[in-house]
Amino acid sequence: MRHLNQTCKLNRTTSHRRCMFANMLKSLISNERIETTVPKAKALRRYADRMITLAKKNTLSARRQAIAELMIRFNPLTPKEQRAAKEGNTQAYNDDRLVIGKLFDVLGTRFATRQGGYTRIVKQGHRVGDNAQTCIIEYLTD
C-alpha cells in the first residue's frame, strides 16, 4: 500500500518523469538557475537537495549514485560524434560529463558547511500561453 508515500506525478509516466527531472537537474547544476512552473520546481527541489548532499560526501560511491540519478551514459562515440570530434566540436558530448565535475567540485564545496535548504524558489508571473504560474529555482550563492 502507498500510505504516506506521495510523489508529485505531474501527469506523466514514470520514465518520462525521471528523464524530465534528470534533464532539469543537469540544467540546474550547469546554469545554477532555471525557469519552470511552480509544481515542477517544488518537485525538483527534492532531487536538487539530494544531489548536493551526495556532492558533499565526495566519495566514489556518491559520484556513481549521482551519475545514475542524472542518467549520464558513458557510451563510446557514434560515427557522427567521431566526425564532430575531429572537427573540434565536442561540446555537446562533454556537457553531461562536465555537470558531474561542477556538482562535486564547485557546488559540493560551496555548501560544505550548510545543513540543508540549498535551493530557492522565486515565483514570477503567469505564462502567456496557458496561464501557468512560473518561477525560478536556483541554488543559493553563499
UniProtKB/Swiss-Prot annotation:
Record GO cellular component, one term: cytosolic large ribosomal subunit
Pfam families per record: Ribosomal_L17 (PF01196)
Matches recorded under Gene3D superfamilies: Ribosomal protein L17
GO biological process, one term: translation
GO MF term (any one): structural constituent of ribosome
Disulfide-bonded cysteines: none
Record's subunit section: Part of the 50S ribosomal subunit. Contacts protein L32.
Protein name per its UniProtKB record: Large ribosomal subunit protein bL17
Organism: Protochlamydia amoebophila (strain UWE25)
Gene (name only): rplQ
